[in-house]
């Protein structure tokens, strides 16, 4: 289905009952073709979604609440358009279910069908809420650098290396901003870049991250673009790119891409999330 058919950017009625057909998948292939990724992917990855506004009715009609974390593999053929995801979750608000496990089973089944691959989830009931914590991304903070910036569309030519030796380091910035390709709404994120290879020029990397400021692309696509541009410019032996975007409509999206053979990171919310 074309993106113009998605609920994003349109006025739509909020559903009054459960409806899995509300989920709107978007193929990853078109964006990846634009990055030259038409064969085996150069990374592993996961899109970590967090749902903060999840509610349903129990068998007696009493509201129940929970939070949930979903992990959609980057190898899946589809992403799920975020407004359709929100509408789908809201369709449970007036739906009676016998127990929380029934809801969990429906979520896993429906989201896996939309993504085209198994979706893992962590179902967080209120008794676990006080175990959740906030933790900022680790790494050397690039935002302290004094740089002059005049590029606000992705400029991979800003990327480069400063030496020939091999190092391992982790860098981070809170200055990633992109925009929804349909509505133009700003998407705010912190991004972490861990690599093994020649030293990446830090000032150039910060200016490159800032250059996304007027760019219109979905969260997942931005992270894959950053990964591919860094691989092309610096050819690190290992590279991991992880972004944590602020929430919208009760959902946040946190794409992670890596060729380091590591497991996906723990889902630790940042202060702005």
Swiss-Prot record:
Q: State whether keyword Oxidoreductase applies.
A: yes
* Active site positions: 180 (thioimide intermediate), 187 (proton donor)
Recorded metabolic or biological pathway in which this protein acts: tRNA modification; tRNA-queuosine biosynthesis
The places in or outside the cell where this protein is found are: Cytoplasm
Q: Which UniProt keywords apply?
A: Cytoplasm, NADP, Oxidoreductase, Queuosine biosynthesis
Catalysed conversion reaction: 7-aminomethyl-7-carbaguanine + 2 NADP(+) = 7-cyano-7-deazaguanine + 2 NADPH + 3 H(+)
Q: Which GO terms describe its cellular component?
A: cytoplasm
Cross-referenced NCBIfam families: QueF (TIGR03138)
Which named protein is this? NADPH-dependent 7-cyano-7-deazaguanine reductase
């Amino acid at each position: 289905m074309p993106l113009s058919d998605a609920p994003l950017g349109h006025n739509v009625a909020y559903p009054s009952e459960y409806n899995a057909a509300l989920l709107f998948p978007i193929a990853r292939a078109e964006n990846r073709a634009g990055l030259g990724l038409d064969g085996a992917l150069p990374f592993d990855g996961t899109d970590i979604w967090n749902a903060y506004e999840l509610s349903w009715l129990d068998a007696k009609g009493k509201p129940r609440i929970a939070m949930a974390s979903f992990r959609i593999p980057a190898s899946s053929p589809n992403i799920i358009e975020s407004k359709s995801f929100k509408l789908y979750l809201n369709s449970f608000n007036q739906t009676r279910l016998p127990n929380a496990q029934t809801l969990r089973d429906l979520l896993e089944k429906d989201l896996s069908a939309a993504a085209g691959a198994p979706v893992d989830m962590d179902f967080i009931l209120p008794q676990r809420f006080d175990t959740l914590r906030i933790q900022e991304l680790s790494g050397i903070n690039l935002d302290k650098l004094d740089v002059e910036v005049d590029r606000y569309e992705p400029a991979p030519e800003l990327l480069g290396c400063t030496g020939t030796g091999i190092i391992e380091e982790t860098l981070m910035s809170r200055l990633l901003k992109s925009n929804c390709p349909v509505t133009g709404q700003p998407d705010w994120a912190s991004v972490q870049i861990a690599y093994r290879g020649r030293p990446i020029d830090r000032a150039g990397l910060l200016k490159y991250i800032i250059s996304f400021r007027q760019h219109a692309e979905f969260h997942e696509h931005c992270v894959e673009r950053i990964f591919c541009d860094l691989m092309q410019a610096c050819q690190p032996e290992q590279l991991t790119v992880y972004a944590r975007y602020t929430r919208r409509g009760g959902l946040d999206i946190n794409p992670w891409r890596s060729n380091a053979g590591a497991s996906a990171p723990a889902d630790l919310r940042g202060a702005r999330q």
